[in-house]
């Protein structure tokens, strides 16, 4: 008799995705981040659901409802901090996952890659709106600054901003709609993640060498299930270390001050995972130019497959491209640091140079490095 997991309509899908899936035998720990992102998403949806049971999306009570969760709800504090720090873990995994894709040439799976970029944008939108919900000073002013960027769009900008706000400033209507969007988007992300997997399983996984591995596949279970479980345990360990020892390490102290439209904080800055994009935004003196650079800093990922000039897929055997990649990583770390600094000398010029370098590395230096390597290999 055939096994039920291979015949049952639902279990067959699970079986083909997580059990009998033919997987390259040599994928490294860099391939763990996909499953970790799935775990992060589930964790965020669950903790978010329990927070939503006690949260009120009204300007008068939002801040105190979060305080109430932390003080009066059973284990509310741990749920709240798991949700806040879970977002940070989510973005760490996201950046690692995208970096892995760039390094090993996984972007040649076009559909998978493009849905991944959409997933990244959707996650960034969700995180931004979630940051507004506690209605602290940084929540309010972050929302004001970022939504105001829409006013840079010619002709329709001002109307668009007021339409997003639901009034003439960030107020009750804005908070309510942000809560609604923040609640619905993770489910859209979950659906998109399934499509992401669907397209990936059409081609099969890439591997560190970038060479087709059809001749050398092993079943996903038990080999990679056990490997993923190790990754999940490490993820939860790091998350719980953050939550239980330094829950506010990655947050902003200003967000413990209730939102006050009459008092602007000295330094408005987003959460750490947006600082690189914020630095690019600030480094251009023109408003529309800054907004375009901000959008392009993420959308440039869509162009990466078309800028691939190498005859090899992975960077494993391409030392010049490896150098470029790690310079890009250093550049992004520099941008992240600059995004958290005040707008004054020398930070302004460092930010501008780092922003120029970011686009230059991806658009010019990496394709040129690949071409040089091709010539060195007499290809």
Swiss-Prot record:
What are the protein's UniProt keywords?
Electron transport, Heme, Iron, Membrane, Metal-binding, Mitochondrion, Mitochondrion inner membrane, Respiratory chain, Transmembrane, Transmembrane helix, Transport, Ubiquinone
Where does it reside?
A: Mitochondrion inner membrane
Query: What residues does heme b b562 bind to?
Result: 83, 182
Statement: the UniProt record of this protein carries the keyword Mitochondrion = yes
- Fetch the CDD domains from UniProt: cytochrome_b_C (cd00290), Cytochrome_b_N (cd00284)
Q: Name one Pfam family in it.
A: Cytochrome_B
Which family is it part of?
Belongs to the cytochrome b family.
What protein name does the entry list? Cytochrome b
User: Where is the organism placed in the taxonomic lineage, from the top?
Assistant: Eukaryota, Metazoa, Chordata, Craniata, Vertebrata
The record's gene field reads: MT-CYB
């Amino acid at each position: 008799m055939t096994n039920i997991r291979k015949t049952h309509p639902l279990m067959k899908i699970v079986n083909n995705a997580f059990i009998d899936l033919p997987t390259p035998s040599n994928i490294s720990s860099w391939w763990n981040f996909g499953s970790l992102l799935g775990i992060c998403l589930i964790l965020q949806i669950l903790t978010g659901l329990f927070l939503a049971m006690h949260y009120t999306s009204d300007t008068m009570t939002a801040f105190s409802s979060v305080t109430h969760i932390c003080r009066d709800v059973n284990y509310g504090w741990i749920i709240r901090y798991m949700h806040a720090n879970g977002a940070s873990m989510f973005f760490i995994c996201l950046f690692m996952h995208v970096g892995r894709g760039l390094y090993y040439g996984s972007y040649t799976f076009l559909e998978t890659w493009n849905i991944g970029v959409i997933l990244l944008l959707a996650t960034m939108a969700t995180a931004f709106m979630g940051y507004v919900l506690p209605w602290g000073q940084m929540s309010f002013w972050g929302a004001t600054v970022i939504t105001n960027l829409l006013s840079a769009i010619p002709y329709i900008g001002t109307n668009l901003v007021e339409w997003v706000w639901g009034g003439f400033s960030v107020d009750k209507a804005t908070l309510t709609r942000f809560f609604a969007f923040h609640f619905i988007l993770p489910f859209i992300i979950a659906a998109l993640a399934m499509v992401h997997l669907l397209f990936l399983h059409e081609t099969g996984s890439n591997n560190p060498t970038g060479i087709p591995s059809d001749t050398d596949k092993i079943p996903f279970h038990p080999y990679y299930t056990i490997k993923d479980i190790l990754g999940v345990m490490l993820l939860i360990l790091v998350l719980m270390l953050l939550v239980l020892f330094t829950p506010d390490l990655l947050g902003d102290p200003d967000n413990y001050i209730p939102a006050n439209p009459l008092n602007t904080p000295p330094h408005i800055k987003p959460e750490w995972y947006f600082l690189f994009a914020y630095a690019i935004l600030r480094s251009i003196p023109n408003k529309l130019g800054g907004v375009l650079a901000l959008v392009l800093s993420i959308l440039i990922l869509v162009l990466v497959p078309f800028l691939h000039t190498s005859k090899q897929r992975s960077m494993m055997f391409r030392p010049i491209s490896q150098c470029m990649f790690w310079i890009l990583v250093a550049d992004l770390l520099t941008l992240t640091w600059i995004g958290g600094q005040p707008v004054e000398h020398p930070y302004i010029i460092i930010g501008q140079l780092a922003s120029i370098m970011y686009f230059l590395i991806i658009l010019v230096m990496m394709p040129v490095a690949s071409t040089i390597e091709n010539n060195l290999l007499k290809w």
